[in-house]
Amino acid sequence: MAEKHVKNMTKFERLTHQEFQRGFSLIEVLVALVILVIGLIGIFNLHIVAKRGSFESFQQTQASYYANDIINRMKLNRTRLANYSGDYTGELSKPSKGCDVAVGAVSLCSPAETEAWDLYQWEQSFIGAAETVDGQNVGGLDSPTACIDIDGNTVTVAVAWRGIREGAGTTYSGNECGKDDLGTRRRIFVVSTVII
């Protein structure tokens, strides 16, 4: 029946009918491309959000490691426990005597020398001094500040760093470590323990 309808059309009607059908398939292709592009943009945005979340998670894990590292060092040097208290930003100078057997220390260190070495090594670790590119530290935390508070045998270690964007972690009022330096992008990990 459709063929009869086309045969009964005038030449002008047939031409306009065919032209309409040719343009219609082009519009379908353009609509499909727009939908595809919108989908790809969504996938790229999802990838960026996942990368940010992965980086924030890695920083949180690193902060936990560094806090527990210094606590373990303090447990091994209990006689100097009160002297570990302070705020640390990576500005300690290298002690004159290295107390790490792994780097060739052959003589025993006093508790004071061990404390100085522990704090120096710990600071170098959380600022990422072991991993550098063109003189810049690329390991460790982003703009870290660490605070150790000691009240008798109770030790509180707070490690603060700069997050990728502003977040809910900035309003934590239980510890002020890094609050002034890191502003609204501050992230903080706090652990308390008792060393007997």
Predicted regions and their residues:
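Short alpha-helix carrying the canonical HExxH Zn2+-binding catalytic motif
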Residues: 27, 64-67
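N-terminal signal-anchor/signal peptide hydrophobic helix marking the start
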Residues: 22-34
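Glutamine-centric residue-chemistry signal
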Residues: 21, 47, 60-62
